[in-house]
């Protein structure tokens, strides 16, 4: 099969032979019609179409040549490849994938893994002889048991790993089939196996053997995935821990189905994180890889529901439309996907404005050539160099250097600027023709305030008419000059105009007014705050304007403390009188008066309280309270304790105990 015509997603179905332990021979539920050409089958009067449909009589070599051999060529070209075996237990998934060590079976029964590795070695050897490029082949073995990944080739195969770090598992080099035999023997020895009602040697975990092909240009992978059985938990007959194994197995298979259906539907968010199995296979279950599904089905009537479920999964996976891409091309495309924010052109460029002068009213830079290219395109190209080829980067840098050389600055004389402000454009044009070319002197930079106003001051030097055309820029004087246009102080820029300029303008200069500006030292904010705090009156609440919240709270607390201390000091002389008053108030009453008061309160409670209030009296329960309320309604009220004692509700010495509890006279 030609590589250009190879489909990115291929689905194949393989019928398993009859299981001998069932002890009966029945017609198969799978039928291969003669018109199918090996690509369709009929199950339960439903026809299913796939890329390949293998009957039970097909050999391992024929299945490998038609299904897996094209993936070997794509692997060496730098593509990611994955082959999955899906189906219920006992249908030959591990047998087809070749998870059994090669030395323990006959050569005609070798599965996909040893055959693929043999072809990889042949092609790697041929390429190294021609190109002399070092190509290394590695292999890793991962088991996913109870939603926990285990590195079967590591030093601690029974310690679970973190799912996100499964790409860093142990990889052993492969140089021959003997190395693969050692890896499979080591991994199979540590893999979990448990007998079920459907298979005496059923795998209770998902196994992933990854072949890594590394070179200077790419690092490609081929994943050989042997999924656990997809049968229901009830059919296994397991309970407890074994039942939980089946639940976790079906969880991983369900996540595989969800990922495949999401990719087929074109969803932007793929649920890779729903299980550990899809998390480990995330790098291979993408739109840039080759996927091959081998659906293993059973010919027995008792397995019809599982067979239909497997075929439906293959039908949904057939809807995938992938666009495989080599690893090197993937990196280039990712580098080209620069965020739009980084592709925006800069407003200024440090390289361009490094030799430019500040823009002010005195000096305005002007380019020598007016036909220069716009800088936005150059800056745009330079800013997005991350996604450009080396030639494009070189061209962008050359354009940037060209712009730097063409952007030469020419200073405009102050005579032009002053006259343009006054409106004498024609005279300024005449003077410009009489002026000699610029002397190349660096223009003086203005003050940091970059003022646009012109200060006109008195001329202090003698008039010289012979120097009208001479370029002159007045130095900065350390005085404050009054502007003629506005009665405000401006930046300290003074200009010395020539006599010809004064004659042309007709404006006589003002008398120079020098305003002495006293320079007061600027104090720190902490010093100013401290001085303001010291100037405040002692004992008064300080002003809370422009102070920190902590300072204001501290001042309020200090003032409150002083007030409290003063009040306590004033209250000390009256302390003895207060104690004497308290002593007179707390004098205990006489026992007889207290007893009479207690009896009165008790009778008031009996005469006025309801049933709930009577229940709160110590020694009276719900029945006694109800009886007291009933007798009170009969008598009207209780006048003394003798009437209460004569009631028939007190049996034995209950009245004496009641009186002791409530401090009453018996």
Curated annotation (Swiss-Prot):
Entry keywords, A to Z: ATP-binding, Coiled coil, Cytoplasm, Cytoskeleton, Microtubule, Motor protein, Nucleotide-binding
CDD domains: KISc
Tissues expressing the protein: In adult female, found in meiotically active ovaries.
Binding site for ATP: 87-94
Location of region: Disordered: 423-450
Gene3D superfamilies: AF1531-like domain, Kinesin motor domain
InterPro entries: Kinesin-like_fam, Kinesin_motor_CS, Kinesin_motor_dom, Kinesin_motor_dom_sf, P-loop_NTPase, RuvA_2-like
Subcellular location: Cytoplasm, Cytoskeleton
Primary localization: cytoplasm
Ranges where the Kinesin motor domain occurs: 8-320
One function term, GO molecular function aspect: microtubule motor activity
SUPFAM superfamilies: P-loop containing nucleoside triphosphate hydrolases (SSF52540), RuvA domain 2-like (SSF47781)
Coiled-coil stretches noted in the UniProt entry, renumbered to this chain: 639-666
Any one annotated GO CC term: microtubule
GO biological process annotation, one example: female meiotic nuclear division
Task of the protein: Required for the distributive chromosome segregation of non-exchange chromosomes during meiosis. May be a microtubule motor required to hold distributively 'paired' chromosomes at the metaphase plate until anaphase.
The family this protein is said to belong to: Belongs to the TRAFAC class myosin-kinesin ATPase superfamily. Kinesin family.
Miscellaneous: The nod(DTW) mutation is a cold-sensitive recessive lethal mutation.
PANTHER family, per the entry: CHROMOSOME-ASSOCIATED KINESIN KIF4A-RELATED (PTHR47969:SF15)
Name of protein: Kinesin-like protein Nod
Protein's organism: Drosophila melanogaster
